């Protein structure tokens, strides 16, 4: 009986040892998997920059609020206290009003119907609103010339309400989606860097591009005397600023087309899916390693106590 008991104890001890070795092997494999398949290997900052570059066409149109829109508005008739610089507030009002509608009515309704707008389609929608805003600026420019030629008068600054409101709606779709995707797909340790990279692609790169674009199209901003002083209606009427707006329209439409391309849509979706899978994968952190060591220690102590008994 004694030998049988010792043999049984040895069997249980051997089985327990094998079980512990199997568990330790699984834990090591899990740690190796987490270290090789972590988020850092899934998405890099270069990928974030490429993702954010998809909204550059919209942001080129968006940057016109502080440049060509102001130039156009400077030759328009003020409406009470509202002049060209004050019209920038229309963009903020648009973001607040339509942001509430889109965030609290449209998106919840789409979620209720289980409809998800792909990220690139949000970029395309934003770029489309940017193109519509530039289109309204083109119409306004033609109206400025028509009224000046017919009556020699300036048109109301309220004509610029449409471009500012439309660019604000586009900002809700394009810019907010860019910030969201840059933050969600970035590795946990690089989210701040990814947000900074996205901020550069949203605000920095488009502004640099606009500087070069303006210098290349400088002749369109000259009056009949060849001077860049077009803040008077007569001088503005002799310039060709509308050609610059048409170029911006083409750039914004290019952004729409690119974001609607199936390969671009599938690539962005694959990046988002890879980032989501990386989040689900356990990460080898100091806390996890500490917990694993403690579990091994507890099992070792429990096994020793069993053998002593």
Tell what function each PLM region has.
Residues 1-284, 288, 295, 309:
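Hydrophobic transmembrane alpha-helices of multi-pass solute transporters/permeases
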Residues 9, 301-305:
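Long, low-complexity Q/N-rich tracts
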